[in-house]
Each structure stands twice: as C-alpha cells, then as structure tokens.
Amino acid sequence: MDAIKKKMQAMKLEKDNAVDRAETAEQQSRDAALRAEKAEEEVRSLQKKIQQIENELDQVQEQLSQANSKLEEKDKALQAAEAEVAAHNRRIQLLEEDLERSEERLKIATQKLEEASQAADESERMRKMLEHRSITDEERMDGLEGQLKEARTMAEDADRKYDEVARKLAMVEADLERAEERAETGETKIVELEEELRVVGNNLKSLEVSEEKALQKEETYEGQIRQMTSRLQEAEARAEFAERSVQKLQKEVDRLEDELVQEKEKYKAISDELDQTFSELTGY
C-alpha cells in the first residue's frame, strides 16, 4: 500500500507538471500572438516606408539610404518570423512528447491498480476460505477467529484504501483530461498563430517584390549618379584648369598694372620736367 501511495503521489506530481506545462503553453501562445501583431505592425511600417521611397525618388542619396535600411529591416523581420515558426514547431513537439509520457504513466498506473485489485480479491478469497473451514480445536478456533477478525480488518482497510486509491485515480484522470484539453487549446492557438505568420510571410514576399522594383529604379538612378559624378569630375577638372588660367591672367594683370604705375610715374616725372622747363622759359 505504501508503494501505491508513493505512485499516486508521483502521479499527482506529474499531473501538476502537466498543468504547469499547459499554462506555460498558453503564456507562450499569448506571447506569440503579441509577436505576430508586432510583426504585422512592422509590415505596415515597411509599406509606408516603401511608399515614401516611391514618392521621394528624386532625392537619390536619401532613397538609397532608406532602401538599404528597409532591406535590413526586412531581413530581420524575416529572420524573426522564421525563428518564431521554428520555436512554435519545437513547442508543439514538446507538448506531443509530454502528452505521450502522460499517457504512458496513466497506462502504468492503471496496470498497478489492477494488480492491487487482484491482491484485494485474493485477500477476500482467503477470508472466505477461513470462514468456511471446519475447526475442531477450540483454542485453534479462537486463534483462527482472531486471525479471521484481523484478516477482515485488513480486508476492510484494503477495501477502504482501494476505494481511496480509485477515487484519487479518478481525480488524477480528470485532472489529466483537463490538462490535455488545455494542451489541445494551446495547440489550436499555435496553429492559428502559424496561419498568421504565414500571412505575414506572404506580406513580406509582396514587400520583397516591391523592394525589387525599387532596387531596379535605384540601379537606374545609380547609373545616372555615376554619369553625373563623371560630369562633375570633368567640370571640376575644367574648373581647376580655368582657375589656373585665371591665376595666370591675374598675374599678367598685376604685371601690367605694375608697368602702368611705372609708366604713370615716368609720365609724371616727364610732365614735371616739362612744367619746370616751361616755367624757366617763361621767366626769361
């Protein structure tokens, strides 16, 4: 009977563990639902950003930066979705394994209960055999009567313990059924979340098509940027050449200005000499 009690305690502990796992599965399902909603919000955000890219294609540098950022976000979202799908598959596998172990333990408990019932039936059979046995010796009969009473007491105790074991087993079976129902509910939620993730995956594929078109446009603008860059380099080269030419011309202008100043000074000196000569001639 002690062995049965220990086994019943072990079954109760396993039942509690099954309930805990079911609650964990429910919490994980809720967490997965929140992640799916977040993924949908990210998809909507990506759609808005792609629209902004299409409306702001004239800003080539900003478009390239935003497109690269969106590609990185798309990769991260896709990796997160794949990781969530793998996690869901792993949780489903764990739940199935736990359910199989619970069913195996229930089967073992049922077999042991049948063995206990057979032992109780054997005790009852021995009690009946002792009741119908012919006893000739009074002292032996008294002793046998005492043994019979003790056997009856043990049989009654065995019956009570059997009834208690059966009642507890029924409670354990009911708890296991409820735990299995909760586990099935968790699996249903997981299936729903997988469907939501599939929809999110389709949305991501649509976004990838849109991004491929945007990338094609980006390549066209990148070609234009390269042409513009080449033209800019040529213009810069011409500007540098013109700047060097201007510097040379400026030096020539400075030289001519210096010569002009010198010629003015010479002219002034000659004028002064003529004035002086004229004054001298007039004085005479």
Swiss-Prot record:
Keyword RNA-binding appears in the UniProt entry: no
Family annotation (Pfam families): Tropomyosin
Coiled-coil residue spans: 1-284
Biased segments, Basic and acidic residues type: 12-41
Keywords annotated in UniProt: Coiled coil, Repeat
Gene3D superfamilies: 1.20.5.170, 1.20.5.340
Domain of life according to the entry: Eukaryota
Region annotation (Disordered) ranges: 1-41
InterPro entries: Tropomyosin
Subunit structure: Homodimer.
Family stated for the protein in its record: Belongs to the tropomyosin family.
Function, in words: Tropomyosin, in association with the troponin complex, plays a central role in the calcium dependent regulation of muscle contraction.
Domain comment quoted from the record: The molecule is in a coiled coil structure that is formed by 2 polypeptide chains. The sequence exhibits a prominent seven-residues periodicity.
Protein name as it appears in the record: Tropomyosin
